[in-house]
Design a protein with these regions (language model features):
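A beta-strand edge to alpha-helix "cap/lid" segment located at domain peripheries
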Residues: 4-43, 50-156
Protein backbone atom coordinates (compact mmCIF):
# COMPACT_ATOMS: atom_id res chain seq x y z
CA UNK A 1 0.00 0.00 0.00
CA UNK A 2 1.35 3.42 -0.91
CA UNK A 3 0.53 6.72 0.78
CA UNK A 4 -1.06 9.52 -1.24
CA UNK A 5 -0.04 13.06 -0.42
CA UNK A 6 -2.09 16.15 -1.26
CA UNK A 7 -1.33 17.50 -4.72
CA UNK A 8 0.66 14.47 -5.86
CA UNK A 9 0.09 11.02 -7.15
CA UNK A 10 1.50 8.29 -4.94
CA UNK A 11 4.64 8.49 -2.86
CA UNK A 12 6.95 5.53 -2.45
CA UNK A 13 6.60 5.50 1.34
CA UNK A 14 4.64 2.41 2.39
CA UNK A 15 1.86 2.85 4.91
CA UNK A 16 2.62 1.04 8.16
CA UNK A 17 0.07 -1.13 9.88
CA UNK A 18 -1.79 0.54 12.71
CA UNK A 19 -1.62 -1.13 16.12
CA UNK A 20 -4.63 -0.01 18.21
CA UNK A 21 -3.04 -1.23 21.48
CA UNK A 22 0.45 -1.84 22.81
CA UNK A 23 -0.52 -5.51 23.13
CA UNK A 24 -1.29 -5.59 19.39
CA UNK A 25 2.14 -4.11 18.65
CA UNK A 26 3.78 -6.68 20.92
CA UNK A 27 1.94 -9.58 19.27
CA UNK A 28 3.10 -8.31 15.85
CA UNK A 29 6.68 -7.97 17.16
CA UNK A 30 6.86 -11.62 18.27
CA UNK A 31 5.08 -12.84 15.13
CA UNK A 32 7.67 -11.02 12.99
CA UNK A 33 10.46 -12.46 15.15
CA UNK A 34 9.21 -16.02 14.69
CA UNK A 35 8.72 -15.55 10.93
CA UNK A 36 12.07 -13.73 10.53
CA UNK A 37 10.15 -11.03 8.63
CA UNK A 38 12.20 -7.84 8.60
CA UNK A 39 9.52 -5.61 7.06
CA UNK A 40 6.88 -6.79 9.55
CA UNK A 41 9.39 -6.31 12.39
CA UNK A 42 10.15 -2.74 11.38
CA UNK A 43 6.45 -1.91 11.08
CA UNK A 44 6.29 -2.30 14.85
CA UNK A 45 9.17 0.12 15.56
CA UNK A 46 8.78 3.89 15.75
CA UNK A 47 10.65 5.58 12.90
CA UNK A 48 12.68 7.62 15.33
CA UNK A 49 16.36 8.14 15.97
CA UNK A 50 15.65 7.73 19.70
CA UNK A 51 14.64 4.04 19.50
CA UNK A 52 16.88 1.63 21.41
CA UNK A 53 17.45 -2.11 21.04
CA UNK A 54 19.67 -4.36 23.15
CA UNK A 55 19.86 -7.99 22.09
CA UNK A 56 21.02 -10.60 24.66
CA UNK A 57 24.73 -10.10 25.24
CA UNK A 58 24.85 -7.35 22.61
CA UNK A 59 25.64 -3.64 22.62
CA UNK A 60 23.11 -0.82 22.96
CA UNK A 61 21.87 0.14 19.49
CA UNK A 62 20.29 3.58 19.11
CA UNK A 63 18.46 4.81 16.03
CA UNK A 64 16.11 3.28 13.50
CA UNK A 65 18.75 2.21 10.95
CA UNK A 66 21.11 0.46 13.43
CA UNK A 67 18.10 -1.35 14.92
CA UNK A 68 16.90 -2.37 11.45
CA UNK A 69 20.37 -3.62 10.49
CA UNK A 70 20.61 -5.71 13.68
CA UNK A 71 17.33 -7.48 12.92
CA UNK A 72 18.41 -8.00 9.30
CA UNK A 73 21.59 -9.74 10.52
CA UNK A 74 19.66 -11.91 12.99
CA UNK A 75 17.13 -12.97 10.36
CA UNK A 76 19.87 -13.58 7.77
CA UNK A 77 21.35 -16.29 10.03
CA UNK A 78 18.53 -18.61 8.98
CA UNK A 79 17.79 -19.77 12.54
CA UNK A 80 14.08 -19.90 13.23
CA UNK A 81 12.88 -19.10 16.72
CA UNK A 82 9.75 -20.09 18.61
CA UNK A 83 9.02 -17.74 21.51
CA UNK A 84 6.80 -18.49 24.50
CA UNK A 85 6.18 -15.48 26.78
CA UNK A 86 5.86 -15.87 30.56
CA UNK A 87 5.91 -13.74 33.72
CA UNK A 88 4.37 -10.78 31.93
CA UNK A 89 3.91 -7.53 33.82
CA UNK A 90 2.27 -4.66 31.92
CA UNK A 91 2.36 -1.04 33.03
CA UNK A 92 0.34 1.22 30.79
CA UNK A 93 -0.86 4.78 30.56
CA UNK A 94 -2.47 6.93 27.90
CA UNK A 95 0.72 7.45 25.87
CA UNK A 96 3.27 4.91 27.11
CA UNK A 97 3.28 1.19 27.93
CA UNK A 98 6.07 -0.86 29.51
CA UNK A 99 6.00 -4.65 29.23
CA UNK A 100 8.36 -6.73 31.38
CA UNK A 101 8.45 -10.44 30.60
CA UNK A 102 10.47 -13.58 30.05
CA UNK A 103 11.08 -14.86 26.53
CA UNK A 104 11.41 -18.64 26.48
CA UNK A 105 13.04 -19.30 23.12
CA UNK A 106 13.33 -22.59 21.28
CA UNK A 107 15.78 -22.51 18.36
CA UNK A 108 15.14 -24.50 15.19
CA UNK A 109 14.20 -28.10 15.91
CA UNK A 110 15.53 -28.19 19.48
CA UNK A 111 13.25 -30.04 21.88
CA UNK A 112 13.80 -27.78 24.90
CA UNK A 113 13.83 -24.00 25.18
CA UNK A 114 17.03 -22.14 25.96
CA UNK A 115 17.38 -20.43 29.37
CA UNK A 116 14.88 -17.56 29.66
CA UNK A 117 15.63 -14.06 28.45
CA UNK A 118 14.49 -11.18 30.68
CA UNK A 119 12.93 -8.56 28.43
CA UNK A 120 11.56 -5.05 28.68
CA UNK A 121 9.58 -3.64 25.75
CA UNK A 122 8.48 0.01 25.75
CA UNK A 123 5.72 1.27 23.44
CA UNK A 124 4.52 4.79 22.66
CA UNK A 125 1.14 5.84 21.35
CA UNK A 126 1.64 7.83 18.16
CA UNK A 127 -0.63 9.41 15.56
CA UNK A 128 -0.37 6.11 13.65
CA UNK A 129 -0.98 3.74 16.56
CA UNK A 130 1.29 2.13 19.12
CA UNK A 131 4.98 1.71 18.19
CA UNK A 132 7.96 0.13 19.90
CA UNK A 133 10.57 2.52 21.33
CA UNK A 134 12.75 0.09 23.32
CA UNK A 135 13.47 -3.64 23.26
CA UNK A 136 15.98 -4.70 25.93
CA UNK A 137 16.63 -8.43 26.23
CA UNK A 138 19.21 -9.93 28.61
CA UNK A 139 19.97 -13.50 29.65
CA UNK A 140 18.21 -14.34 32.91
CA UNK A 141 20.66 -14.86 35.75
CA UNK A 142 21.18 -18.48 36.69
CA UNK A 143 20.06 -19.37 40.20
CA UNK A 144 23.18 -19.60 42.38
CA UNK A 145 23.97 -22.87 44.12
CA UNK A 146 23.87 -22.15 47.86
CA UNK A 147 25.80 -23.95 50.54
CA UNK A 148 23.86 -25.16 53.58
CA UNK A 149 23.21 -22.25 55.94
CA UNK A 150 23.75 -19.58 53.28
CA UNK A 151 21.09 -16.89 53.55
CA UNK A 152 19.83 -14.78 50.68
CA UNK A 153 22.14 -12.06 49.42
CA UNK A 154 20.53 -8.65 48.79
CA UNK A 155 22.17 -6.33 46.29
CA UNK A 156 20.19 -3.20 47.23
Amino acid sequence: VLAASPGSLLTSRPVKRTFPTAQDAEAAFYEALEKADLEAMMEVWAEDEEVVCIHPGGPRLAGYEPVRESWAQIFKSGQRLKVHLTNQVVLSGMMLAVHSLHENITVGGEAKPRPPVVTTNVYSRTATGWRMLVHHASPAPQAPVRAAGDGPKVLH
